[in-house]
Amino acid sequence: MKFISWNVNGLLACVGKDFENQFKELDADFFCLQETKMQEGQLDLQFEGYESYWNYAEKKGYSGTAIYTKHKPLNVSYGMGVEEHDHEGRIITLEYDQFYLVTCYTPNSQTELKRLDYRMTWEDDFRKLLKSLDAKKPVVICGDLNVAHEEIDIKNPKTNRRNAGFTDEEREKMTVLLNDGFTDSFRYLHPDEVTYSWWSYRFKAREKNAGWRIDYFLVSDRIKEQITEAKIHTEIMGSDHCPVEVDLMF
């Protein structure tokens, strides 16, 4: 099964940049989107053979997630069931016979780390959700997790040490999550590869490949040997992020 995750940084804008053709060419079983910035009824974008599920932020033009799938789920849930976290459309969970699929758009800690304390609370609560799912069946987690985990995952680690997405605190939360029974699929197959998934729109960052790897597929440790492919599609434009992929044998 082929899974794609992409922070589209505004789906309306991305649709204007060849999104529909890219979607069809990737031909995924599951296509997860973050930062859709959509409101309900704003865009009717359907693809033959796919069902879609949407979680919208209450604030207009902000955040939001979606999943297109060729496989009808047993159950769908939105958010993590914690009032504090469930106003920004950041999580969708699909349940299947053999696994859960969770797509997530993790809150950015923002300039001057204004939201870092909130981010720490989010991380702990999100980890609890994933562990509760993992106790029932394996979990596939994808999305913009807004952290470059190790120095290999960011072009300029030293100058970004206290910037949102590369603080010691955020990186440690990712370490704790992985140690609790999850595998970073890309690093599992490509332990030494330097590839990024996000580039600032400023300073010609993408042209210079001054990027960050902040988009992930994590899987429960017990299915890591079912990973057959893990890719970062740096060739695909349309957003400041590029799509990431994992292929799993189920």
Predicted region positions:
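Structured beta-strand-rich core segments of catalytic domains in phosphoester-bond hydrolases
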Residues: K37, Q42-S109
